[in-house]
Amino acid sequence: MLIFEHSRPGRRNYSQSPKAAEATDIPEKLLRKTLPLLPEVSEMDAVRHYTRLSQKNFSIDTHFYPLGSCTMKYNPRACNSLAMLPQFLARHPRSPESTGQGFLACMYELQEILKDVTGMAGVSLTPMAGAQGELIGIAMIRAYHESRGDTARTEIIVPDAAHGTNPATAVMCGYKVVEIATDKEGNVDMAALKAAVGPKTAGLMLTNPSTLGVFEENVAEMSRIVHQAGGLLYYDGANLNAILGKVKPGDMGFDVIHINLHKTFSTPHGGGGPGSAPVGVAPRLLPFMPVPIVAFENGTYRWQTEKDIPQSIGRLSAHMGNAGVLLRAYVYVRLLGAEGMHRVAEFAALNANYLMAELRKAGFEIAYPNRRASHEFIVTLKDLKEKTGVTAMNLAKRLLDKGYHAPTTYFPLLVPECLLIEPAETESKETLDAFVTAMKEILEETRTQPDLVKSAPHTTPVRRLDDVKAARELDLAWKAPTRNITRTETLTPIPTVSVA
């Protein structure tokens, strides 16, 4: 049930601590003429409702979450605690620089750390989501070409295994997308790349390791080809976790990168957000970076603005990005240190390769059996579907009954009936072994009880949804009652407490 379905007129009982002063000085013109259509429930009913919902949540705090290309790692509670210190929370974004030196120091150090681990010449912390970071990266590439009068470059090259945001970003920046194929080993087809590159090439967008879970073996040659043609290289930082502290995108030849803090640097995902995706640039793109950026000059931290970077592509937010998320990432990298970041990549690769080997032994088909998993890998159920009729979606739904979140399904699109599995570095061997056991059980069920798997899930609060009906008959908002309640109507009195 929705909270609105618990609502009863006049039931607005709640406890409230005494206030120092009533807000009686609000101008009449700013007051609502009708009361907001909020649910009217008792405090106890509200607490019970949301507690029940929280108990139905499936999250990284409750279960193993091997969602490929998402890096669902544990978020250390120390990061939350320190980022929520009163000194940070009470600071106004527009407070004078002189009163925010501690915060600015944290942001400056985060910029410097991200520069170091990515091999970039400069970093801006302002983008507020991965997709926005992508957009800014391609916008800087466009600004670079336009500053040189090189307006004939109208194409962005994108591999067929790329995230869907890559071509969308290129189109939003006014470019034509040129898709190139992947070879049988999961690498970008070099012949296709050479054929696609030319005087119209503005750049190449690449994720490395790719969404196929393998490292691009020819990345240095790809960089040479694109740069020789006058284009630039964009690095989608979605899978940076796999190479953190081991390989720097700047050393591979990339000119611009965005970093998903909710993946590599363990800030909360989704509803635990908001997001943040700093961008890093090579020297040639420094003049176009979004502002503000923190500078350290003469022993003082300060904001660099459009006055300092006149060719900047501009601002992305009212202030400087999602400060609370950036603080969490800063605490995370300080907790890890350089050695800890090395271990992140090592254990991400170790867990992925161990899990891949165990599932292969269990009878699952690996999409790229000759390649080492970088941090994730793909299982294809193409043959299983032909033999039993069980699809990747069926198996994913059945995993929910076993207490595991499903891996990413049907992505990348070029691998049929695929599961993209990423265990992340924070999972224990015992957790991975238990997951393998569950996968073995489901594999046996596909042979002995295929209908059980096809009709899953059976134990979740919500069963299988009608995807077609949901898409065609949208029901996205609560339909409020038509009666308006005016401010002059008699309301149920709320008890007050006098304090001596």
Swiss-Prot record:
GO terms for cellular component: cytosol; glycine cleavage complex. Residues 1-25 are annotated as: Disordered. Its EC number is 1.4.4.2. GO terms for molecular function: glycine binding; glycine dehydrogenase (decarboxylating) activity; pyridoxal phosphate binding. The keyword rRNA-binding does not apply. The modification N6-(pyridoxal phosphate)lysine is found at K263. It catalyses: N(6)-[(R)-lipoyl]-L-lysyl-[glycine-cleavage complex H protein] + glycine + H(+) = N(6)-[(R)-S(8)-aminomethyldihydrolipoyl]-L-lysyl-[glycine-cleavage complex H protein] + CO2. Keywords: Oxidoreductase, Pyridoxal phosphate. The keyword Flavoprotein does not apply. GO terms for biological process: glycine decarboxylation via glycine cleavage system. SUPFAM superfamilies: PLP-dependent transferases (SSF53383). Pfam families: Aminotran_5, GcvP2_C. Gene3D superfamilies: 6.20.440.10, Aspartate Aminotransferase, domain 1, Type I PLP-dependent aspartate aminotransferase-like (Major domain). Its cofactor is pyridoxal 5'-phosphate. HAMAP family: GcvPB. PANTHER family: GLYCINE DEHYDROGENASE (DECARBOXYLATING), MITOCHONDRIAL, GLYCINE DEHYDROGENASE, DECARBOXYLATING. The glycine cleavage system is composed of four proteins: P, T, L and H. In this organism, the P 'protein' is a heterodimer of two subunits. Belongs to the GcvP family. C-terminal subunit subfamily. The glycine cleavage system catalyzes the degradation of glycine. The P protein binds the alpha-amino group of glycine through its pyridoxal phosphate cofactor; CO(2) is released and the remaining methylamine moiety is then transferred to the lipoamide cofactor of the H protein. This is Probable glycine dehydrogenase (decarboxylating) subunit 2. It comes from Nitrosospira multiformis (strain ATCC 25196 / NCIMB 11849 / C 71). The gene is gcvPB.
